[in-house]
Amino acid sequence: MTAPEPAPESATATARRILAALVEAGVTEIVVAPGSRNAPLSFAAYDAAAAGLVRLHTRLDERTAGFLALGLTRSGRRAAVVCTSGTAVANLHPAVLEAAHAGVDLVVVSADRPARLRGTGANQTTDQVGIFGPLVPTQDASGPVELLTAGPVHLNVPLEEPLVPDDRWLPDVVPGEPAHRVIPASLTVLARGPRTVVVAGDDAGPRVRVLAEQAGWPLLAEPSSGSRTGDNAIRTYRLLLDGDLGARVERVVVGGHPTLSRPVSRLLARPDVEVVDLGAWGVWSERPFPVHSRILGGVGVDAPVDAADGTADDTDWLEEWRTADRAVSARLDALLAAEPGLTPHEVAGAVARALPAGGLLVVGASSPIRDLDLMVPRYDVGARRKVVANRGLAGIDGTISTAVGAALGRPRSTRALTLMGDVTFLHDAGALVIGPGEAVPDLTIVVVNDDGGSIFAMLEQGAAEYADQYDRLFGTPHRVDLASLCAATRTPHWRVDSLAELEHALASPAGGIEVVEAVVRRDNRRDLDERIRALRP
């Protein structure tokens, strides 16, 4: 006589098992988008939050929920986003793609209909296994939950009815710590010889800055690199690269994910320049430029040699960059000060100056992060300012949600700012819809409003021969009244059109989420950018 097969696990039991596994893996933040099929997971998350094991966030829209979880993770928390079946899962795709390309450990938990219903036309049923493509394989939720892989994880959870519990859950779970990436213990020593610059792309981290200082090399660091501190950081590097100094570079040591400037891209692609890659996380670890050597462990430089033997590198190399940087910076500041009205560069500079030690700044893609790149001051080492940008795929979507999540993941006493363009703001305006009882950070959103997209004015599409098509296809003026939009969500709003007004608004945060709209011109953007590029020596 054969033993009876065990009863299948109930939806409630499955959901509680998965929530317990998430907590044991170090997840401390759960973002839920409402739905019926994910109800068992939502109830389990609610009970885990009531037990003090996680913090629960609810959002109406899955795209917002996904980027909120991404921002929480970027701030150092471990977050999971929970959604129902069907198109709800597809709306998480932008956040998942960004996480995959940036190496962010986002956890996605999607509820699903039973597998037998796939391909039958059943309501809200599609094939969710592998929905995010080969970048993010789907885990079978019937087995052990595995969260040790770098980058996003997708757990797909088929759930049978009933979808509501019979009792409250009192979880007996020991919270775990997220797994941390470990740099291999090996050490590679670089020769000082060639004229070298250090390029720090997004999320390069402080070790890139340390290497530049040890070697005495110029540091060309993007704002979100985590490296733009200390005396070796060169503010106007992208202007200098197009001049004589850039032409004399013989070697580049690159860390992180550099994506901001064409001068850096051209430098890395030059056949006469040796490129040393310090390695990177995310699916972009294979570089789009030739790499001569890759270092996955620690890195240092050899000891200085005696200049008398004629083999020492050019000891004036760093000072040449510093001197040129000071001169170009002074000319840039003078040019901007002479401009009538407020410029987007001045907005970026004011935001950078308003960021205190220990503060958080989330920067949107497109023009604002490039303007910030020219204007951010050389911050002090150890001041622990954190600049975050979604540079994995460099999209404008989800920027407000990312900023809200990143701010929620930081201590409440930390000043949090975000800088973005008006199109980026409108793209994620739904992130301002936050229900009663939800955690709300102190966050100042600075919107550079030029009534459309100005970055294309600086690209080929902005050339004079396309003027009759430009606005409709690329400039995309929208004429949205941001004050009214903010009023609809009861978000405080200030409109400024001078540097003095902007600095006053930034110096007097109201608490909670607030929007400071800085109005700038768009019609002169291409001309202004050309005059800035002409400042290079």
From Swiss-Prot:
Pathway connected to this protein: Quinol/quinone metabolism; 1,4-dihydroxy-2-naphthoate biosynthesis; 1,4-dihydroxy-2-naphthoate from chorismate: step 2/7; Quinol/quinone metabolism; menaquinone biosynthesis
SUPFAM superfamilies linked to this entry: Thiamin diphosphate-binding fold (THDP-binding)
Cross-referenced Pfam families: TPP_enzyme_C, TPP_enzyme_N
Cofactor: how and how many bound: Binds 1 thiamine pyrophosphate per subunit.
Enzymatic reactions: isochorismate + 2-oxoglutarate + H(+) = 5-enolpyruvoyl-6-hydroxy-2-succinyl-cyclohex-3-ene-1-carboxylate + CO2
Gene Ontology molecular function: 2-succinyl-5-enolpyruvyl-6-hydroxy-3-cyclohexene-1-carboxylic-acid synthase activity; magnesium ion binding; manganese ion binding; thiamine pyrophosphate binding
InterPro entries: MenaQ_synth_MenD, THDP-binding, Thiamin_PyroP_enz_TPP-bd_dom, TPP_enzyme_TPP-bd
Presence of the UniProt keyword Manganese in the record: yes
Highest rank taxon of the organism: Bacteria
Keywords: Magnesium, Manganese, Menaquinone biosynthesis, Metal-binding, Thiamine pyrophosphate, Transferase
Biological processes annotated in GO: menaquinone biosynthetic process
Ribonucleoprotein listed as a keyword: no
EC number: 2.2.1.9
PANTHER family (UniProt xref): 2-SUCCINYL-5-ENOLPYRUVYL-6-HYDROXY-3-CYCLOHEXENE-1-CARBOXYLATE SYNTHASE, PROTEIN PHYLLO, CHLOROPLASTIC
Family statement drawn from the similarity comment of this UniProt entry: Belongs to the TPP enzyme family. MenD subfamily.
Biological function: Catalyzes the thiamine diphosphate-dependent decarboxylation of 2-oxoglutarate and the subsequent addition of the resulting succinic semialdehyde-thiamine pyrophosphate anion to isochorismate to yield 2-succinyl-5-enolpyruvyl-6-hydroxy-3-cyclohexene-1-carboxylate (SEPHCHC).
NCBIfam families: menD
HAMAP family: MenD (MF_01659)
Protein name: 2-succinyl-5-enolpyruvyl-6-hydroxy-3-cyclohexene-1-carboxylate synthase
Organism name: Nocardioides sp. (strain ATCC BAA-499 / JS614)
Source species taxonomy: Bacteria, Bacillati, Actinomycetota, Actinomycetes, Propionibacteriales
